[in-house]
UniProtKB/Swiss-Prot annotation:
Family recorded in the similarity comment: In the N-terminal section; belongs to the Fmt family. UDP-L-Ara4N formyltransferase subfamily.
The reaction(s) this protein catalyses: UDP-alpha-D-glucuronate + NAD(+) = UDP-beta-L-threo-pentopyranos-4-ulose + CO2 + NADH; UDP-4-amino-4-deoxy-beta-L-arabinose + (6R)-10-formyltetrahydrofolate = UDP-4-deoxy-4-formamido-beta-L-arabinose + (6S)-5,6,7,8-tetrahydrofolate + H(+)
Site feature Raises pKa of active site His, where: 140
Species assigned in the record: Pectobacterium carotovorum subsp. carotovorum (strain PC1)
Subunit comment: Homohexamer, formed by a dimer of trimers.
A GO CC annotation given for this chain: membrane
Region described as Dehydrogenase ArnADH: spans on this chain: 320-672
Gene: arnA
Protein name per Swiss-Prot or TrEMBL: Bifunctional polymyxin resistance protein ArnA
Gene3D superfamilies membership: 3.40.50.12230, NAD(P)-binding Rossmann-like Domain
Residues binding (6R)-10-formyltetrahydrofolate, per UniProt: 114, 136-140
Keyword tags: Antibiotic resistance, Lipid A biosynthesis, Lipid biosynthesis, Lipid metabolism, Lipopolysaccharide biosynthesis, Multifunctional enzyme, NAD, Oxidoreductase, Transferase
Region (Formyltransferase ArnAFT) residue spans: 1-310
Length: 672
């Protein structure tokens, strides 16, 4: 059986050797060039492949069409991935006749994602394992071929646990590879209800929080001790790395019978530190520039004394809040995002918009700073605040379909030209930008689900001017990506899929046709006019509750471990798919059950209209728009939870309660 192998790390070498022993014809090996600055304690896949006289490659982008074609020409029967760090595209996964298989270092579906050996130790697990599974487009989500359990002892570190997993993986592969070769495997679907995702870890994640229990801190130390960068703390301005420790119970560590504050040094020989629960004896460690030594010698070298405190870097104890600049802060996303950020004391918000009705409730908050202004005029204010702030969100855009055909040049000027200035300022001042792309960039993509990394972006002919919004946003996406690749711009692109909820827009906007679909439908119900179904309302969309969407966006801004940097993330709810006609029916049901129903006119029915008469000749519609949310799940540990019926009811309730009572009465009388 012909095999192509994607491999890295010790497990990659184990996989190669197992394939050789099982009699596979290894056509090629793909691996990674070693990253500078990384501690390479593991064996080299490139060297192992060379010793087997197998062609070996380390492309920067293995999913590039050139490499896909080269793999296609080899016509593999099977593909194996052993700790390869890049997600393989569907184009590659579909090439082998018998499929693709991956070896993952956990008992799937738990601990999908990155660094599972480290994460199980951090979380205090007593068991982990290795899993051989079929590869699908979602990382670590395919059907299971087989898995083996690895027991975790209290003294295990990431290195010893990795050794156990390596031995277990070799045994598992020796058992399963012959069955794959003879095509005799049995597959078991993963239980999605048990799935968990974990992102990559960085050296900064080793910072010790002494408020945690001694057991939790010791778990962190075990997870990141040598050969990893180590768990660390600070004595004043000096960094202290802790390599090994042991948990001591409270009764044995009270100073003068009194429990000490977390982080307080209880004794120096042995070196014992108080924790949120119990205490920790530092067995070995070192100062940032010192040698590896015992805990007591470390205490002597650094001048530690009882009751001194370990903790965060002293100069950072009063850490400055993250400053977030929101341009378009009064808009639908802007005002909901402000509300979410203000619930977290770590953030300070600076906002600009041409009005303030939606954010009036925040104007007295000392962490919210608002200026009324226009992004096309207040260039100096914007540049100054880009320099001042940490995270930039330019949310200003014309984003209603009728405007794409009615005012295409204005759409281009605002959505592209004005936002390009902001992007360039972020590059100039080295600021992180979280940019609102759009589901519109996928255009008429024919994929079942729109994938950020693989789906084609398909738009219509030039005479269909509705696409000017889509291509303006797409070009900015590409410019931002290029600035990231060439100038080191830190960015995240997020693509909202039909977010709905209170304060979406206004009924006045709907009266001139410049609103979202649900607002237009609500206006029809409020005024007693027929609901217009453009081209019959068969178009399907996936509607996302604003609270679900904002929580995902908040996690992007939070950006734990930097894992959102350089990423494109769809934020939508693929389970809430409905046609516009179905949305209208759902809205009507909610409207008829609403306590204010009797204050509004009778329902005037549905009528079908052509898109050209409603939007203009330059319009072209899209049959469906369904997001893949694998990136959001993987990077944000996020999934939408709010059902569409709840979102529709809450959105309707908001609009009905904002209608002027006198106006509502007048509407009823007029229609009567």
């Amino acid at each position: 059986m012909k095999a192509i192998v994607f491999a890295y790390h010790d497990i990659g070498c184990v996989g190669l050797e197992a394939l050789k022993l099982a009699g596979y014809e290894i056509q090629a090996v793909f691996t990674h060039s070693d990253a500078p600055g990384e501690n390479h304690f593991y064996a080299s896949v490139a060297k192992a492949a060379a010793e087997m006289d197998v062609p070996v490659f380390a492309p920067e982008d293995v999913n590039h069409p050139l490499w896909v074609n080269r793999i296609r020409e080899l016509a593999p029967d099977v593909i194996f991935s052993f700790y390869y760090r890049t997600l393989l595209s569907d184009d590659i996964l579909q090439l082998p006749s018998f499929g693709a298989f991956n070896l993952h270092g956990s008992l799937l579906p738990r601990y999908r994602g990155r660094a599972p050996v480290n994460w199980v130790l951090v979380n205090g697990e007593t068991q982990t394992g290795v899993t051989l599974h079929k590869m699908v487009s979602r990382a670590d989500a395919g059907d299971i071929v087989a898995q083996s359990v690895v027991e975790i002892d209290d003294e295990d570190t990431a290195l010893t646990l990795h050794g156990k997993c390596r031995t277990t993986a070799a045994a598992l592969l020796a058992q399963q590879l012959p069955l794959i070769r003879s095509r005799e495997i049995m597959l078991t679907p993963q239980d999605e209800s048990q799935a968990s995702y974990f992102g990559r870890r960085t050296a900064a994640d080793g910072l010790i929080d002494w408020q945690k229990s001694a057991r939790e801190i010791n778990n962190l130390i075990r997870a990141v001790t040598e050969p990893y960068p180590g768990a660390f703390t600070f004595l004043g301005e000096r960094k202290v790395v802790i390599w090994r420790a042991r948990v001591l119970k409270n009764d044995s560590v009270k100073a003068n019978g009194v429990k000490q504050e977390p982080g307080s040094i209880i004794s120096t020989s042995p070196l014992v530190v108080s924790c949120g629960e119990d205490a920790l004896e530092i067995v070995s460690g070192q100062s940032e520039s010192g040698l590896y030594m015992s805990g007591s010698r470390l205490a002597a070298e650094m001048g530690m004394v009882p009751q001194a405190k370990l903790g965060n870097l002293a100069s950072r104890v009063q850490r400055r809040r993250t400053r977030v600049l929101i341009l378009g802060v009064n808009g639908f996303i802007g005002n909901h995002l402000t509300e979410r950020l203000l619930r977290d004391d770590r953030y300070e918000i600076y906002g600009l918009d041409i009005s303030s009705d939606a954010i009036a409730r925040f104007l007295g908050d000392p962490r919210f700073h608002f200026v009324e202004g226009d992004i096309s005029i207040h260039n100096e204010w914007i540049e100054y605040h880009i320099k001042k702030c940490d995270v930039i969100l330019p949310l200003v855009a014309i984003a209603t379909p009728i405007e794409y055909t009615r005012n295409p040049l204005r759409v281009f000027e605002l959505d592209f030209e004005e936002n390009l200035k902001i992007v360039r300022d972020c590059v100039r001042y080295n600021k992180r930008i979280v940019f609102p792309s759009t589901s519109e960039v996928y255009g008429m993509c024919d994929d079942k689900e729109f994938d950020e990394d693989t789906s084609r972006l398909i738009v219509g002919p030039i005479n269909k001017q509705r696409w000017i919004y889509s291509v303006s946003k797409q070009l900015l996406d590409r410019v931002i990506w290029a600035y990231g690749a060439k100038n080191g711009l830190r960015f995240t692109l997020f693509r909202p899929f039909n977010w709905m909820g209170p304060r979406l827009d206004t009924l006045d906007a709907a009266r001139i046709g410049s609103s979202r679909a649900i607002t237009q439908l609500i206006l029809n119900l409020v005024e007693g006019s027929p609901i217009k179904l453009v081209d019959g309302g068969a178009q399907k969309r996936c509607f996302t509750d604003i609270h679900d969407g904002i929580e995902a966006l908040f996690r992007i801004i939070e950006n734990r471990n930097g894992q959102c940097d350089g990423q494109i993330i769809n934020i939508g709810n693929p389970h809430n798919e409905a046609s516009i006609r179905e949305l209208g029916d759902m809205l009507l049901t909610s409207f008829n059950a609403h306590p204010l129903r009797d204050r509004f006119p009778p329902f005037a029915g549905f009528i079908e209209v052509e898109s050209s008469s409603y939007y203009g000749k330059g319009y072209q519609d899209v049959a469906h728009r369904t997001p893949s949310i694998r990136n959001a799940k993987r990077l944000l540990e996020w999934e939408p939870t709010v059902k569409m019926e709840q979102t529709v009811a809450e959105t309707l309730d908001y609009f009905l309660r904002t209608v002027d009572p006198q106006h509502a009465d007048n509407v009823t009388d007029t229609q009567g």
